[in-house]
Amino acid sequence: MDMNEHRNRRLKLIMISATFGGLLFGYDTGVINGALPFMARPDQLDLTPVTEGLVTSILLLGAAFGALLCGRLADRYGRRKMILNLSFLFFLASLGTALAPNVFIMAVFRFLLGLAVGGASAMVPAFLAEMAPHEKRGRMVTQNELMIVGGQFLAYVFNAILGVTMANTGHVWRYMLVICAVPAIMLFASMLKVPESPRWLISKGKNSEALRVLKQIREDKRAEAECREIQEAVEKDTALEKASLKDFSTPWLRRLLWIGIGVAIVNQITGVNSIMYYGTQILKESGFGTKAALIANIGNGLISVIAVIFGIWLVGKVRRRPILLIGLAGTTTALLLIAIFSIVLDGSMALPYVVLSLTVLFLAFMQGCVGPVTWLVIAEIFPQRLRGLGSGISVFFLWILNFVIGFAFPILLSSVGLSFTFFIFVALGVLAIGFVYKFMPETKGRTLEELEEHFRSRHDHNTPEQSVIEV
């Protein structure tokens, strides 16, 4: 085996190991979709629309704080160490949810599981962005998105198998939830073989160790040049005080933070997680039975996987901004059609199949365009010293909005119906398109250090009135 092949295999091992965090993220957020109908039974947890929303969304609230907390801790203790600790939390919380005797205990462990999900959502993309060469960064970071939707797909498949074969077993939802403990063990075992981020090592003065890591995944001369480039960027940062919220009072950093938060919000106001968490209920609302809805929901998971594979190829070829704009136009149109047909075909036998087809179309645009670019841009735009904090804050807002949507959706669905609920998401989708067109910068084709220098120097030389669209 020649050295280049060895380095590529090493880089692939790093990517696969870290993205088990994405798989856990996906399974834990997707499994509730099929578990809820069984969990809600009177002889189980006896859930109401409000407690359904609570059990679903408390994980998302935990994820918001997990992203914020883990971002700071990772800047202090390292990306790899945080991911290892998160694997233990995934394992513990998975067992807790599977064994929960009542709604209160379930909510506690779902919150703890959320801390792990949120931490992984912030840490894994940042870790991959720091390990990847710039020409592979887009594909490597979006592999995490593939693992997220792969985890959701596996959750839907296991839900359907268990839900159909054990439909008369009330506690079948416990088997659905405990499966998540397996990838948690795999994440821990695989991350033991992965090195720390060289950018984090240099930020802590461990330059020789960072160079050794870079030489494992880069050609020697390139590793040395990249090491010097990172050191120069870190030296500029160390002239400043320790990373804190005060840093974002600097105009160019404040602008990047608002862009990061904005892109995170854009991801959620598409309404994607109303479908990912409540797809089974949406299909039941449109006319499917419980078993048919569980099986049909596999289609949503499968198209998500196919779309992300396409998205990984796309981000390697096309700029970030047009991908995101096209994706948002597609998701907004699909939701508009669901809302319209829910009125026009109300009571028709065709409605459930039309809704299923349109949710598949929605997810094709969402997972192929919107999702990959969202996580990639959040991982790219912040400078090294503030990457953990900036990513953590951005992802915090993503999860807070996710929590609001996850909690409110079943209540909206039961009170105002499917069509009006989706009309709300259509209006928000139009606002999202406007934000991306006006404010989101282009980040493709530059190293993380080049992006940092570009954003910094652009603010120094440009007038405040100039739009970020020019970046």
Curated annotation (Swiss-Prot):
Chief location: membrane
Origin: domain of life: Bacteria
Membrane topology type: Multi-pass membrane protein
Coiled-coil portions: none
TM regions (residue ranges): 13-33, 50-70, 88-108, 111-131, 146-166, 175-195, 256-276, 295-315, 323-343, 358-378, 393-413, 416-436
Keywords, alphabetical: Cell membrane, Membrane, Transmembrane, Transmembrane helix, Transport
GO cellular component terms given for this protein: membrane; plasma membrane
A GO term, aspect molecular function: D-glucose transmembrane transporter activity
Gene Ontology BP annotations: D-glucose transmembrane transport
InterPro entries: MFS_dom, MFS_sugar_transport-like, MFS_Sugar_Transporter, MFS_trans_sf, Sugar/inositol_transpt, Sugar_transporter_CS, XylE-like
Similarity comment text for this entry: Belongs to the major facilitator superfamily. Sugar transporter (TC 2.A.1.1) family.
Full protein name: Putative metabolite transport protein YncC
Organism per entry: Bacillus subtilis (strain 168)
